[in-house]
């Protein structure tokens, strides 16, 4: 007992705490090894990670205390100011969190509480894309009310993780052209059936084309570029001639940057980009762990959620430039693979971007741009799903009907101009 009485210094107490944490976690890990599967995770809690964090925080607090108490005056003042600022930020976050949670409860209490869809069951990990549709899999897009499905839609993916585009007329004898579609959930067809997507309606309007859907939930220009840089799509497409279409919405700028909101929404699982070479180099959360952690902190902030803020706070000229450069790089990669320049950017109707410079930037880079912003109002009740914020099948149909007309005006893909 005399040993513990003599060793009562701060460092000794820190050592006792660390030893206690290690012994406790070793005991829990030992129990989990015999009663669980031996992976160190018990009831979804990673015991090793918890132990590391406890020790790391304890050491950090002790070091901070010693520096404030015994450090030079300048360092003491800096650290005290920093701690004060952090405490104020934390206090504001807590208070705004209470207000936000209360307002959310009052807003939703009188509305039907729908659950789903469970997007986590729709994708698999990919070393360059971050996430991709599970190959040869049907994802059931389901919304439930009081535990019962109210909307249930099957979304089928093929062996190349492309959403299957069924033929409107399976008896057509010859489809000798391809149409590659890149984009986000608008193109993939969030909340609509396989025969209600953008690629489907294009294929229905153009019987000599076979459409291939390379889009997915939450995709961005980064994903289109990564797919073209790391996959040989000519080996996935049987036709030798055709076109590629990238469907653009203004939110793709968020994803190109990426903004803190988008880092959080996609949990950092999207392609990283070397802007100097325009090469995709892996998955963002693993290449930039510090930026990823910082982005997640902002994303989870109650202040950000309550005031609907993001970081950066608005689109900067360089953000638009980066987005345009990404789409241009995708066009160049497409041209390398398919040996033609039939790459078009379709600008989806979107009332939120009247002053966007994107169309001008794309045209400056020599891209073929089809501006459909005024084709129909979106978002609007007429063209927005009642059970989701995405476009209706009718909106997709109208868009592809207009695209078909524009292609026919110039005699097909070879003569299309921007």
Spell out what each predicted region is:
Residues 181, 240-253, 303-377:
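Conserved, well-ordered alpha-helix/loop/beta-strand core segments that scaffold catalytic motifs
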Residues 102-125, 219-314:
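Interaction-surface signature
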Residues 203-204, 212-217, 222, 351-393:
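Extended hydrophobic/aromatic segments used for targeting, binding, or gating
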Residues 386-418:
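Histidine-centered active-site loop/cap adjacent to the catalytic His
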Residues 3-21:
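N-terminal membrane topogenic signal
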Residues 15-66:
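Membrane-embedded alpha-helical segments of integral membrane proteins
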Residues 100-200, 204-205, 376-379:
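Membrane/wall-proximal cationic-aromatic binding patches
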Residues 73-99:
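Internal/C-terminal transmembrane anchor helices
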């Amino acid at each position: 007992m005399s040993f513990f009485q003599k060793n009562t210094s701060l460092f000794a107490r820190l050592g006792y705490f660390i030893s206690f944490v290690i012994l406790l976690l070793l005991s829990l890990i030992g129990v989990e090894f015999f009663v669980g599967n031996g992976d160190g995770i018990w009831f979804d809690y990673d015991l090793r990670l918890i132990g590391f964090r406890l020790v790391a925080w304890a050491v950090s607090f002790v070091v901070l205390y010693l520096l404030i108490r015994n450090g030079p005056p300048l360092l003491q003042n800096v650290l005290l100011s920093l701690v004060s600022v952090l405490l104020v930020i934390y206090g504001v976050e807590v208070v705004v969190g209470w207000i936000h949670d209360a307002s959310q409860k009052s807003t939703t209490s009188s509305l039907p509480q729908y659950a789903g869809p469970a997007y986590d069951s729709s994708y698999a990990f990919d070393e360059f894309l971050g996430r991709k549709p599970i190959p040869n899999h049907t994802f059931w897009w389901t919304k439930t009310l009081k535990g019962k499905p109210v909307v249930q839609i099957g979304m089928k993916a093929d062996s190349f993780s492309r959403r299957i585009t069924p033929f409107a007329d399976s008896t057509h004898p010859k489809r000798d052209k391809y149409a590659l579609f890149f984009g986000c959930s608008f193109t993939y067809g969030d909340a609509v059936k396989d025969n209600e997507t953008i690629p489907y309606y294009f294929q229905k309007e153009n019987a000599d084309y076979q459409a291939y859907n390379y889009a997915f939930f939450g995709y961005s220009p980064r994903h289109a570029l990564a797919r073209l840089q790391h996959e040989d799509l000519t080996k996935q497409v049987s036709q030798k001639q055709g076109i590629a279409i990238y469907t653009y919405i203004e939110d793709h700028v968020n994803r190109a940057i990426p903004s803190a909101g988008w880092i959080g929404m996609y949990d950092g699982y999207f392609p990283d980009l070397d802007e100097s070479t325009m090469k995709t180099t892996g998955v963002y959360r693993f290449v930039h762990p510090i930026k990823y952690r910082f982005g997640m902190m902002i994303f989870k902030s109650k202040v950000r959620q309550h005031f609907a803020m993001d970081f950066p706070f608005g689109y900067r000229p360089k953000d638009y430039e980066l987005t345009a450069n990404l789409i241009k790089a995708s066009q160049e990669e497409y041209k390398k693979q398919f040996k033609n320049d039939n790459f078009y950017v379709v600008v989806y109707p979107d009332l939120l971007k009247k002053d966007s410079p994107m169309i001008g930037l794309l045209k400056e880079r020599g891209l073929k741009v089809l501006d459909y912003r005024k084709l129909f109002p979106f978002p609007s009740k007429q063209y927005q799903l009642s059970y989701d914020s995405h476009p209706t099948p009718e909106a997709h149909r109208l868009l592809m009907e207009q695209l078909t007309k524009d292609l026919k005006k110039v005699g097909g893909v070879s003569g299309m101009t921007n």
